[in-house]
């Protein structure tokens, strides 16, 4: 007996690699003209939620949300309603802020591991 397959399941390579000439991020303006809608390909809820939380903490942003349009599509949409600022700049600044926070976290984590190894003789063999 054969194993049933999902006919609408995308190819694995389409979930991991952008097609030639395809852009990672695209930006459109909402129908009302007050929001920027960014589509980020090859990303999921992990980065979407992180960016949304960072944007919601920014005083230059009135509204921020994200959604994954379809579970079989490996893309997210981030909607930003800025307070008179350029949405592209807001997204860029907030992503750079996230990268800075991650770098700080990584540095602090490495320091704590080193301090733990120095105080614990069990790890001297490694």
Swiss-Prot record:
Gene Ontology terms, MF aspect: DNA binding; DNA-directed RNA polymerase activity; protein dimerization activity
GO BP term, pick one: transcription by RNA polymerase II
Pfam families in the cross-refs: RNA_pol_L_2 (PF13656)
Compartment list: Nucleus
GO CC term, one of those recorded: RNA polymerase II, holoenzyme
Principal localisation: nucleus
PROSITE patterns assigned to the protein according to its UniProt record, in alphabetical order: RNA_POL_L_13KD
Membrane-spanning residues: none
Superkingdom of this protein's organism: Eukaryota
Subunit-structure text: Component of the RNA polymerase II (Pol II) complex consisting of 12 subunits.
Similarity comment: family membership: Belongs to the archaeal Rpo11/eukaryotic RPB11/RPC19 RNA polymerase subunit family.
Role: DNA-dependent RNA polymerase catalyzes the transcription of DNA into RNA using the four ribonucleoside triphosphates as substrates. Component of RNA polymerase II which synthesizes mRNA precursors and many functional non-coding RNAs. Pol II is the central component of the basal RNA polymerase II transcription machinery. It is composed of mobile elements that move relative to each other. RPB11 is part of the core element with the central large cleft.
Protein name: Probable DNA-directed RNA polymerase II subunit RPB11
Source species: Plasmodium falciparum (isolate 3D7)
């Amino acid at each position: 007996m054969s194993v049933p397959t999902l006919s609408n399941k995308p190819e694995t390579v389409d979930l991991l690699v952008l097609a030639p000439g395809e852009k990672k991020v695209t930006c459109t303006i909402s129908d009302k003209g007050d929001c920027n809608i960014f589509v980020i390909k090859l990303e999921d809820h992990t980065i979407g939620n992180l960016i949304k939380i960072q944007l919601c903490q920014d005083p230059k942003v009135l509204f921020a949300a994200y959604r994954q349009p379809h579970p079989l599509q490996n893309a997210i949409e981030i909607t930003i309603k800025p307070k008179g600022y350029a949405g592209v700049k807001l997204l860029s600044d907030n992503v750079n802020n996230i990268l800075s926070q991650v770098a700080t976290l990584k540095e602090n984590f490495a320091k704590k591991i080193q301090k733990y190894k120095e105080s614990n003789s069990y790890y001297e063999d490694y």
